[in-house]
Amino acid sequence: MARRGKKPVVRTLEDLTLDSGYGGAADSVRSSNLSLCCSDSHPASPYGGSCWPPLADSMHSRHNSFDTVNTALVEDSEGLDCAGQHCSRLLPDLDEVPWTLQELEALLLRSRDPRAGPAVPGGLPKDALAKLSTLVSRALVRIAKEAQRLSLRFAKCTKYEIQSAMEIVLSWGLAAHCTAAALAALSLYNMSSAGGDRLGRGKSARCGLTFSVGRVYRWMVDSRVALRIHEHAAIYLTACMESLFRDIYSRVVASGVPRSCSGPGSGSGSGPGPSSGPGAAPAADKEREAPGGGAASGGACSAASSASGGSSCCAPPAAAAAAVPPAAAANHHHHHHHALHEAPKFTVETLEHTVNNDSEIWGLLQPYQHLICGKNASGVLCLPDSLNLHRDPQRSNKPGELPMFSQSELRTIEQSLLATRVGSIAELSDLVSRAMHHLQPLNAKHHGNGTPLHHKQGALYWEPEALYTLCYFMHCPQMEWENPNVEPSKVNLQVERPFLVLPPLMEWIRVAVAHAGHRRSFSMDSDDVRQAARLLLPGVDCEPRQLRADDCFCASRKLDAVAIEAKFKQDLGFRMLNCGRTDLVKQAVSLLGPDGINTMSEQGMTPLMYACVRGDEAMVQMLLDAGADLNVEVVSTPHKYPSVHPETRHWTALTFAVLHGHIPVVQLLLDAGAKVEGSVEHGEENYSETPLQLAAAVGNFELVSLLLERGADPLIGTMYRNGISTTPQGDMNSFSQAAAHGHRNVFRKLLAQPEKEKSDILSLEEILAEGTDLAETAPPPLCASRNSKAKLRALREAMYHSAEHGYVDVTIDIRSIGVPWTLHTWLESLRIAFQQHRRPLIQCLLKEFKTIQEEEYTEELVTQGLPLMFEILKASKNEVISQQLCVIFTHCYGPYPIPKLTEIKRKQTSRLDPHFLNNKEMSDVTFLVEGRPFYAHKVLLFTASPRFKALLSSKPTNDGTCIEIGYVKYSIFQLVMQYLYYGGPESLLIKNNEIMELLSAAKFFQLEALQRHCEIICAKSINTDNCVDIYNHAKFLGVTELSAYCEGYFLKNMMVLIENEAFKQLLYDKNGEGTGQDVLQDLQRTLAIRIQSIHLSSSKGSVV
């Protein structure tokens, strides 16, 4: 093998010695990364490299790993298809995602840029929406998987785990956008918590989101992201998904790529062409914007030439870099100048083109288990916009100052970030040092843009073991052969990872920093690098990080030698206690410091807490015997213990034992005198979750029973640190935790717990809430005492969460004990029952609608409730359900009368004496109706209506000419003429069997006053027998006022009409190509208008 690969290796080494423009040569003419874009003028080498053009003499020199940014070694060609690298699919495409295409379309249309032109009349293409949904669902799975691993430390998923997962999976820019969106949504949610209608509005509405937060929460529970899901985590994940959708959609719309263009990997299977990559035109734009011409855009993009046209499983084969002069890129930009001004369209083609050419989102949306970062579908390495200094050439401290870096320094820094291989640990240390030095001031000037190093206490640094671990994954033995003192090995015992699967250094840094930041550490250790390798490299895996005492150990250089020595001794003491040997307790305590056995680590935890996390019952007993404090709390002082996780503040050893479900340890702590409520003191506010809340959330029946036996209070909730809470006892009590996670048996256990009597001291809020109920002798159920009132509030909150998350059985259980419905909880329960096709439950819920107070009717009834109920009516073949829906519709229509039709006052026009009606002697025009002449006068008819004027104008004025009128009976035509000659309908004698024909004639001759008169007669004569005929006739003629009146009659008398066969045929008959559906839509619209006028308007019924 060595002999076979010797010549290609020599060729590759020759390529490695060529200066690609980043070796610091000031006279390099190919100093731009854009010059590395692949070009058809340089055919691919059979050795997997590129045929380089003639080079300047100054470029023939040896250089370090800066040249490995986009240089492919010969072994790459053997593994370009990731053979043996386990490029398996991430997961099958999700069958069910926590959003619908309708919600996705509404989200994208709401966030549409007005500059993109008018919206498409028919909405966004369904195939493009489905494609986008499938792609982003992969990002959802990636973020959920990382959040799942992070949540193992505390057996709980909070907003911090979701935010860290976003920073791990997403690029710096995307993570910043998602974090900002999540913070905005959570702020709106917290502000809405202070309102009295918080349980009457959905979580999405309270957050200002389009996707259902409750559905995302249920998806997280069903996907086992964690044993416990905090509601803020679901809000963060929902906002993150919406932000991703908006970001990708805006990039597609802003791309301006014509539909005929297709990038690599867009389905055609062709290899990348000259215009592939993140866009030659945008790159050329960067050249022009930056000072120094092409040199200024160095590091913006690094392209790779294609050795073959096919696509590999990771990316199209990209070999060594090929040079393209800046002029060629400018010509390419000019070539696409007109394309950039074409109206962008959101189609499958433009979506694929944008994704394939965007290095920030292409790898994220691929189906492979590992995450491809920093490259697009062509294998082009690119820096994200947040790290590209050339986008802001004046990035200095003050205007007028010199730039922070020279152009050569910028190229060196950016190439440090893009390096994929190193030859030695010294070289890697230099690269990491350059990269971290670059990221530090960038983050300081643009704080909050998602870049790393966000700790205010100091800069992050790399531990030596972390650098050695990173060097193991990035090391390239062949690069050592440049040293003339090193002889290449004759036998290759190592399998080289192909270039295509190697991430750039900036991605190693990004992921490692995100892991270190999640545990609030100031240094990256080797485990952070292994976690990054697991994510970024195919076929690499490692266990999730466990909660350890040395997670955040930091030997900061700011501390003196004495302080560092004390820290090392303390760390040794914790290690001795964590090893599990009970015979080392006395020796370990002597090393911990002045606080002894109760010494806290950097994470604010004592040795007893760590033993409870491990479930080491023997060590717990030994620590208790040694005098460990049972009820000491995790501190909440970040300036002294900056590595404390925010969610663990005020937790006790019992809390940690409950978190990880160690029942024997819980029993031991309780027997030893641990407080069953954790850190909660009687009468004080609770800012952390109690052990019972945590046990109820996970559904541990045995643990819940044990805590209840020891006196735990299920009514205690959690106060948010911003002071916003709806009840004195906080939110998300144990009832709500069990209901939110769907633990029905635990909820019933909590419900069966007898109430504890409180003291007779009343708070001011309780006094005001009591009101006149103090004097009542027979209060309703659940209101017999102040405890019962608190329980009722807790159960109402639990009912809200169970309905939001789709646990309808728990919701019904809560309703069965007398907790009243809100409109929102009822609608959510009905929606879930309909989706699950549970007919008996639908009937039960529909029967309960009348228990909802009309004062609680909100806009949700119109926007969400009516569409749902009419959909059930359309889909249901059950007569009982249909009758119940009719009862609801009639109830919502209200007792007020149907809006009356009013006569139209006819404008005063010329009129003739009735004596001239059908008088042959005085007439000047003759109509022929049913073969019989009818004599009239033009002077009257010309001004009667536009229709008569058109009839008279279309006929010659010769004597004896008759105007034939078809489809109108003679008697009906006579009534029309009588109306005209008499000047009104007062003298008309209309028979019942003539009214419909007269209405048709009035509509045909455009006589609005006569038409309205006929409509009024029809409205007065409407009954259950003829209402369907009148409605059909009115719809056929297009008489909207009479149609609306009939729809009001239907809704007001629907309970009776549902037994009418003609009415049922009108609703359900599909022979008319969707006629039934149109009727239901019209009824829904009419009922919505009615509800608005009598329930939701300020007049409350005065306007009907």
From Swiss-Prot:
PANTHER family documented for this protein: ANKYRIN REPEAT AND BTB/POZ DOMAIN-CONTAINING, ANKYRIN REPEAT AND BTB_POZ DOMAIN-CONTAINING PROTEIN 3
Tagged with keyword Repeat: yes
Any single biological process term in GO: synaptic transmission, glutamatergic
Pfam family, one: BTB
Chain's gene name: ABTB3
Keyword Repeat: yes
Gly residues bias spans: 264-276
ANK repeat start and end residues: 603-632, 649-678, 687-716, 730-759, 825-854
GO molecular function terms attached to this record: PDZ domain binding; protein heterodimerization activity
Region Disordered, residue ranges: 260-301
Phylogenetic classification of the source organism: Eukaryota, Metazoa, Chordata, Craniata, Vertebrata
Inducing stimuli: By all-trans retinoic acid (ATRA).
Domain BTB, chain residue ranges per copy: 923-989
Record field: transmembrane: 168-188
Name of the protein: Ankyrin repeat- and BTB/POZ domain-containing protein 3
Domain of life: Eukaryota
Entries under CDD domains matching the protein: BACK_BTBD11, BTB_POZ_BTBD11, HFD_ABTB2-like
Keyword line: ANK repeat, Membrane, Repeat, Transmembrane, Transmembrane helix
Membrane-related topology note: Single-pass membrane protein
Provenance organism: Homo sapiens (Human)
A GO CC term attached to the entry: glutamatergic synapse
Subcellular location, record wording: Membrane
